[in-house]
Design a protein with these regions (language model features):
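Structural/interface elements that position substrates and couple domains in central-metabolism enzymes
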Residues: 1-177
Length: 177
């Protein structure tokens, strides 16, 4: 139980900022391990044998809370004259992951001798997290837009997302799968 509304709000913001930072750490590890040729999920599985290991997975961080609340905290800190380096570093890492995923897909296409321009890529899932209809601040759009810049024909399907809302927010037509 929080002692005041300020304490309750601060608690909620740090819960989301902490999750954001933990995911950013694992995202950064995924980038490093990818460069080393090591499977990140294998590393995380092995690390998970330690009783106090925090089980986070690499991925996109969007939505209306986790990808936003750290900025509220950072803004307030800066307003008070403090520069929150870890919080902002986490945001930078997570905000870059869509581009990173797209660039890795492009590299895979090139390595396999596939044509990048006019390649067809199916993205299964647009909402900011699984099994919900919420598309607010979805970072999947970053992957889509980056692939489109390379001339990739991107098809998107998501049975949870509302077709009209997706078109209104992102100008995308969902494909049926």
């Amino acid at each position: 139980r929080a002692s005041s509304i300020k304490v309750a709000e601060a608690a909620k913001v740090i819960e989301n900022a902490q999750r954001d930072i933990n995911i950013a750490f694992v995202n950064e590890l995924a980038v490093i391990f990818n460069k080393m040729g090591i499977n990140t999920l294998d590393v995380l599985e092995a690390a998970g044998t330690k009783w106090n290991f925090l089980n986070f997975r690499p991925g996109l961080v969007g939505g209306h809370c986790i990808g936003v609340d750290p900025y509220y905290l950072a803004y307030k800190a800066q307003e008070l004259g403090y520069h929150p380096e870890v919080i902002l570093a986490g945001r930078r890492i997570n905000d870059h992951m869509g581009k990173y995923v797209a660039e890795n897909l492009i590299k895979q296409l090139i390595r396999t001798g596939s044509s990048v321009r006019d390649a067809k890529v199916l993205i299964m899932g647009l909402t900011f997290k699984e099994d919900v209809p919420d598309i607010r601040n979805t970072k999947v759009i970053d992957i889509i837009r980056e692939l489109e810049e390379y001339g990739v024909n991107v098809l998107v399907c998501d049975p949870y997302a509302d077709q009209e809302q997706v078109y209104h927010e992102y100008g995308l037509s969902l494909s049926q799968f």
